[in-house]
Amino acid sequence: MKTITKGSKGEEVKILQSVLHLAQDGIFGSMTEEALNDFKKSHNLPEDGICDTRTWIALLPDRLLTAHKRTINEIIVHCTATPEGRDYTVEQIRKQHKAQGWNDIGYHYVVYRDGSIHEGRSVEVTGAHCNGHNLHSIGVVYVGGCDKAMRPKDTRTDAQKESLYFLLKVLKRHYPKATIHGHNEYAAKACPSFNVKEEYIDL
């Protein structure tokens, strides 16, 4: 689902209006914006009038997260291993992964430095992010994980920490038997540069 806001038109707007119990004219106007902000307020999301990936997850969890036949046993957290303060987009990661011979970005969700959550590879498709654990897992990555000298460091912004927790909580709600892990539990790496088990012990 793409990000939409006031002025947007099309099928995604109709879906949003349907979920919000509005007339479905496919035009994102003031009434849709107001209803969306009411929904976001009730779900502790920023009242910014933007229906982004994080909002879609809250609006349509079944549509976004369970419309596939894969059994999910693990949710694995990664970092992009990029320097603190540097942005890194889904398209940049996709380009890097394709250059390595993969057919798409390896991760399913990417959390940017501003806290926005972006879809990578479709959850319906097996990822390519953790050897031996891809078939029944979801790969979540945050941008960062290294200091400016490329040494491992937890560089997560407050917004990233909040969004990671939010996303993992939603994923756990839909895959209650899935366990949350850091990449470093399965490989001799520092990734994701923080203790996942300790941080998400309550999930």
Where are these regions (language model features)?
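Second-shell loop/turn segments in exported
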Residues: 2-7, 22-24, 45, 78-84, ...
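Short acidic, glycine/serine/threonine-rich helix-capping segments at coil-helix boundaries
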Residues: 2-61
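Basic/polar, cationic surfaces and motifs that engage anionic cell-wall
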Residues: 12, 34, 41, 54-76, ...
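Surface-exposed patches in mature extracellular/periplasmic domains of secreted proteins
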Residues: 47, 101-108, 175-184
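Cell wall/extracellular polymer interaction/catalysis modules
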Residues: 50-104, 108
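Short, surface-exposed beta-strand/loop micro-motifs that present aromatic residues
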Residues: 128-132
